[in-house]
Structures are given as C-alpha cells and as structure tokens.
C-alpha cells in the first residue's frame, strides 16, 4: 500500500483556490432583520449585525429608514416617509448605502423634499450625480478668508452688518419680526448678478424650509417666481406636516445640493429657515430613540447637529476652485431671549448675528434690525470700499441718536446741537426703513447714506424722505454718472464725492416738500456755532 504524503503547500493552494472562487448565494449574502416595534416614525429592528451607522435600510413596503441607534440587540431606525404601513414582524433589509441625494443644475427652479424628490409636479429632475448628506466640512487649509461682498440689498445690513461670501450670518428674533423677509430679499437681490451671466458674480440660492406651514412655503415660492428669482433658486421643503425625520434631514439635503456647486468653483447662498425647528425635530427623534436627554430635553450632541452643518459654509481656496457657500441660518427666540440654549449655540458657531427686535418692528421700523447688538465678525473685510467709507459715520450718528433719544424723553428743553442731532438721527432712521421685496443696489445705498450722514436730509420732513430718496436717485441716474462710477469701481473717490455733492445740491434746488416749499440748495442749513458744538461733542465722545 502506497504511503500517503501530505504536502502543506498543496493544501494551502487548494484552500486559496476555493476561497477565491467562492461566490455566496443571494440568501447567504443578504442580511435580513425583523421589526420588533414601530410607532411615531421610529422602528426598532433586530438582526442585521453588519448594519452601519447612518446606513439606509429598506422595509417590506419599500419605505426607507435611517439607522441611527446601533444597540447590542436592536437598531433604532428613523422611518423616512409614511410609517403607517410598517408593522411588527415585517422583514427589513440592508441596502449597503449611506443616505445621499441627487445634485446638479437641474435642481434650479425646483421644489424638492429632503430626499431630493421633486414635489412641484414639474416632472423628474436632471441630475449630475449623487452626494452623501454626511460629509466632512472643508478643513482649515482648504479655506480662504472671506473677502468678497454678498449684497443683501438691505441698507441697514449692507452698511453696518456687512456679509461676505462664505460667511455664516445668523438672523435671530421673535416670531413675526421679518426674519424670512430679510432672507428672501437677499435672494431677490442676486437677480442682477445672475442676469449678468458672469460666473464670478452669479450666486445660486438654496432655501430650506423646515417646519413651516405649507401656505408659507407656497407664498415664498410665489414671491421668488414673481420676481424672476426662482430660476436660480432651489427650495427644499420639509413642512410642518412632514415626519420629524424629514425636518431633521432637510438642512443637510440643502447643504449637499449647495456643496456640489461650491466645489465646482461657483457661489452659493443657503438659507436655513429655521434651525430652531430642526433642533426640536432632532429632540423628538432622540427621545423616541430613548437617547438620554440633556438641557431642555435636547440630546447631548445638539451642538454638533448645527456645527457640522454650518461649518460646511466656507470660502474655498484657489486650489479648490475658489467657490463659496454663504449660510443664513434663522433662529426663532422666545420673548427676545437670545441667551437660551439653541440661540447661544448657533451664535457661537456663526460669524455674526442680525438681531431683530419685536419692539422696533411694532414701532414700524422695518427691517427691525437692532444695530446695537447685531454684529458681523468677518464681513467688514468684504465690504465695498465706498460703503465702508460712508457707513462709519452712520454707526456713530445712530449710536448718539439712540442715547440722546432716551435722554430727550425726560428733558424739557434741549440745546440747538442736541436738537440737530435728534433731527439727523430721526432722518437716518427713516432712511434705513425699507419695504419688503425692494432690495437696493449698492451704489444707490452709498449715495443715500452719504446724503444722510452729510446733512442733506436734515431739513427734509420725515414723511418726505422716501420720496426724496427715489427722486434723488432718479435724478442722479439721468443727469450724472456717479452711480455708474460707484457700481463699477466700488469706490467713493474725492472726484466721485464732489460729483455726488453737486448732483445732490442741484436736486435739492428743485425738490418741493409736502408743504409745497422748495427745501433749497447749497450746503445743509445749520448755524456754524451749533455745528462746532456738535463736532466738539462727537470728538469728546470718541475720546471717552
């Protein structure tokens, strides 16, 4: 009988050959889990030991779910869609994919849900690929400092709280104070840039509606369409009737759509309206998943919820195409309390805030921007030079007016300098009022703020200021090239300023107030001694 010899090399080769040629059957390859609990948009699934965090799972009826909790025996799944058809005992399968959305220029002018599906009845969207919702924000070396202006068309903001491309500027205030109006006006103001056809000027806009009424979203879409702004805007809608999971995901969907354009070297403006409702939706999801609650019952990672979203807004370096994504997150406060949990979180993440006061709104000061506590931390570097030149004195005039106004309420008589200061402050305050959906070009803003801070509105009645404004701008367009010079260069040179002074003075000689009297021309009327006293007070306040 021949002796049996065992060669390890042959055994090893046979095993390698078997392993390399092995193809598992579909049943062996596919993991199947079962629903053990389903309620309130949340499902608990047992099985699926290989499921990943944030992986998409598919239920029997085709509904998708997002794996958020990976416990030892169960997976906590947020149902993405209608959950009434999901019952205990149903099978659940892995998809092997993380949540992503389609992206591309086909989304311009469309209204989509948080999964990227069109809901406007205009057919399918032409896409250019897909982008994962959970993406790392650009690193420090991938960024560039904010240095290009993003004009909102709102005088109070562009002059005193400027925004740059790539900045995160919070809009915060009580309900019904005009937060959405500021964001929509900013989108409308990008139309001239879009119509120019210059890619370096064009700004694509994304409006993310979170927890809003369906009628409100429809009115926003109508306003954009009427103004011709819908062609460069995408609306991601997660109305109040949507499940909490959709409201939680909507901002990330809008961000993914915008990031696609940003990494192509284009400029994007994204509005999150509003992140308070996203935080509430995330709180609801977390409590249903039995995550431990923290302050105000929010989960411990609610700060990370917003920081990882807003850090995606950036100005990219030249090596990455120099694209940008500017973020305008909106936060709703209760009783003007900016020190609450979510407002302070988002204030600490963003590059500045525009605070809207309900008292100012009710006093008909609209937009109701509280200049005192509103700030832009990085926008000053991006501000148009001509605007920066005229806005410095505007801040000083308004600050002095506010302090003097409070004092004047209790004073029986005031000196001439104080009365002149109050008059100018009232004129400037009236000048900064602006109706909704009426953004101003930057050159128009520069001309009017220059006129106000140089005293050319001091003898104009408050009721006549807006008529004076529109007629003056019309006069400057027809008879001078001042506005074109400011628009093309962004500067207010000595020559341009002299031409502007001549244009304003010639117009004042023809402007009649509501009483029918010509207000006159030349230098603004004021007593020389009073001006000296006023200047001395300004110098003293600056030194103090």
UniProtKB/Swiss-Prot annotation:
<dbReference type="GO" id="GO:0005886">
    <property type="term" value="C:plasma membrane"/>
</dbReference>
<feature type="compositionally biased region" description="Acidic residues">
    <location>
        <begin position="524"/>
        <end position="535"/>
    </location>
</feature>
<comment type="similarity">
    <text>Belongs to the ATPase alpha/beta chains family.</text>
</comment>
<keyword id="KW-0547">Nucleotide-binding</keyword>
<dbReference type="InterPro" id="IPR000194">
    <property type="entry name" value="ATPase_F1/V1/A1_a/bsu_nucl-bd"/>
</dbReference>
<dbReference type="InterPro" id="IPR027417">
    <property type="entry name" value="P-loop_NTPase"/>
</dbReference>
<dbReference type="Pfam" id="PF00306">
    <property type="entry name" value="ATP-synt_ab_C"/>
</dbReference>
<dbReference type="GO" id="GO:0045259">
    <property type="term" value="C:proton-transporting ATP synthase complex"/>
</dbReference>
<keyword id="KW-0066">ATP synthesis</keyword>
<dbReference type="GO" id="GO:0005524">
    <property type="term" value="F:ATP binding"/>
</dbReference>
<keyword id="KW-1003">Cell membrane</keyword>
<dbReference type="Pfam" id="PF02874">
    <property type="entry name" value="ATP-synt_ab_N"/>
</dbReference>
<comment type="function">
    <text>Produces ATP from ADP in the presence of a proton gradient across the membrane. The alpha chain is a regulatory subunit.</text>
</comment>
<keyword id="KW-1278">Translocase</keyword>
<dbReference type="GO" id="GO:0043531">
    <property type="term" value="F:ADP binding"/>
</dbReference>
<dbReference type="InterPro" id="IPR036121">
    <property type="entry name" value="ATPase_F1/V1/A1_a/bsu_N_sf"/>
</dbReference>
<dbReference type="InterPro" id="IPR033732">
    <property type="entry name" value="ATP_synth_F1_a_nt-bd_dom"/>
</dbReference>
<feature type="region of interest" description="Disordered">
    <location>
        <begin position="513"/>
        <end position="544"/>
    </location>
</feature>
<protein>
    <recommendedName>
        <fullName>ATP synthase subunit alpha</fullName>
        <ecNumber>7.1.2.2</ecNumber>
    </recommendedName>
</protein>
<keyword id="KW-0472">Membrane</keyword>
<keyword id="KW-0139">CF(1)</keyword>
<feature type="site" description="Required for activity">
    <location>
        <position position="374"/>
    </location>
</feature>
<dbReference type="InterPro" id="IPR000793">
    <property type="entry name" value="ATP_synth_asu_C"/>
</dbReference>
<keyword id="KW-0375">Hydrogen ion transport</keyword>
<comment type="subunit">
    <text>F-type ATPases have 2 components, CF(1) - the catalytic core - and CF(0) - the membrane proton channel. CF(1) has five subunits: alpha(3), beta(3), gamma(1), delta(1), epsilon(1). CF(0) has three main subunits: a(1), b(2) and c(9-12). The alpha and beta chains form an alternating ring which encloses part of the gamma chain. CF(1) is attached to CF(0) by a central stalk formed by the gamma and epsilon chains, while a peripheral stalk is formed by the delta and b chains.</text>
</comment>
<dbReference type="Pfam" id="PF00006">
    <property type="entry name" value="ATP-synt_ab"/>
</dbReference>
<dbReference type="GO" id="GO:0046933">
    <property type="term" value="F:proton-transporting ATP synthase activity, rotational mechanism"/>
</dbReference>
<feature type="binding site">
    <location>
        <begin position="173"/>
        <end position="180"/>
    </location>
    <ligand>
        <name>ATP</name>
    </ligand>
</feature>
<dbReference type="InterPro" id="IPR023366">
    <property type="entry name" value="ATP_synth_asu-like_sf"/>
</dbReference>
<dbReference type="InterPro" id="IPR004100">
    <property type="entry name" value="ATPase_F1/V1/A1_a/bsu_N"/>
</dbReference>
<keyword id="KW-0406">Ion transport</keyword>
<keyword id="KW-0067">ATP-binding</keyword>
<dbReference type="InterPro" id="IPR038376">
    <property type="entry name" value="ATP_synth_asu_C_sf"/>
</dbReference>
<dbReference type="InterPro" id="IPR020003">
    <property type="entry name" value="ATPase_a/bsu_AS"/>
</dbReference>
<keyword id="KW-0813">Transport</keyword>
<dbReference type="InterPro" id="IPR005294">
    <property type="entry name" value="ATP_synth_F1_asu"/>
</dbReference>
């Amino acid at each position: 009988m021949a002796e049996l010899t065992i060669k390890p090399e042959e055994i090893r080769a046979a095993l390698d050959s078997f392993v390399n040629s092995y193809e598992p059957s579909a049943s062996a390859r596919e993991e199947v889990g079962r629903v053990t609990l389903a309620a309130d948009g949340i499902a608990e699934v047992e099985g699926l030991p290989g499921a990943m965090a944030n992986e998409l799972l598919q239920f029997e009826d085709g509904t998708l779910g997002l794996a958020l909790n990976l416990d030892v025996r169960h997976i906590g799944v947020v149902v993405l869609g209608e959950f009434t058809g999901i019952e205990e005992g149903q099978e659940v399968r892995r998809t092997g994919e993380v949540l992503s959305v389609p992206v591309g220029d086909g989304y311009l002018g469309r209204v989509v849900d948080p999964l990227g599906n069109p809901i406007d009845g205009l057919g399918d969207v032409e896409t250019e690929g897909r982008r994962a919702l959970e993406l790392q924000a650009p690193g420090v070396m991938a960024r560039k400092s904010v240095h290009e202006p993003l004009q909102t068309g709102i005088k109070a903001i562009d002059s005193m709280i400027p925004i740059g491309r790539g900045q995160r500027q919070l809009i915060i205030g009580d309900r019904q104070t005009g937060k959405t109006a500021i964001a929509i006006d900013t989108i409308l103001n990008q139309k001239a840039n879009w119509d120019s056809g210059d890619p370096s000027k064009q700004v694509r806009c994304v409006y993310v509606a979170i927890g809003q009424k369906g009628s409100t979203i429809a009115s926003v879409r109508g306003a954009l369409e009427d103004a011709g702004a819908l062609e460069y805007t995408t609306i991601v809608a997660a109305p109040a009737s949507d499940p909490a999971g959709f409201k939680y995901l909507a901002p990330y969907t809008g961000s993914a759509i915008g990031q696609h354009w940003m990494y192509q070297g284009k400029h994007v403006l994204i509005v999150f309206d509003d992140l308070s409702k996203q935080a509430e939706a995330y709180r609801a999801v977390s409590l249903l998943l039995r995550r431990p609650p923290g302050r105000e019952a929010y989960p411990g990672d609610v700060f990370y919820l917003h920081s990882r979203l807003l850090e995606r807004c950036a100005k990219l370096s030249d090596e990455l195409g120099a694209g940008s994504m500017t973020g305008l997150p909106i936060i709703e406060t209760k009783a003007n309390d900016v020190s609450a949990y979510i407002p302070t979180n988002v204030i600490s993440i963003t590059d500045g805030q525009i605070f809207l006061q309900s008292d100012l709104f009710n006093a008909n000061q609209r937009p109701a921007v509280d200049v005192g506590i509103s700030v832009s931390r990085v926008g000053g570097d991006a501000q148009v030079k001509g605007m920066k030149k005229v806005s410095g004195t505007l801040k000083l005039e308004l600050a002095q007016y506010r302090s003097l106004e409070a004092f004047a309420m209790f004073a029986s008589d005031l000196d001439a300098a104080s009365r002149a200061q109050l008059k100018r402050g009232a004129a400037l305050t009236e000048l900064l009022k602006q109706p909704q959906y009426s953004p101003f070009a930057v050159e128009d803003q520069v001309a009017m703020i220059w006129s106000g801070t140089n005293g050319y509105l001091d003898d104009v009645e408050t009721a006549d200021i807006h008529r004076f404004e529109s007629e003056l701008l019309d006069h400057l367009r027809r008879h001078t090239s001042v506005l074109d010079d400011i628009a093309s260069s962004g500067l207010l040179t000595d020559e341009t300023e002299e031409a502007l002074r001549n244009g304003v003075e010639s117009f004042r000689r023809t402007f009649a107030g509501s009483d029918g009297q010509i207000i006159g021309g030349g230098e603004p009327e004021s007593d020389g001694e009073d001006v000296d006293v006023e200047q001395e007070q300004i110098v003293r306040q600056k030194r103090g």
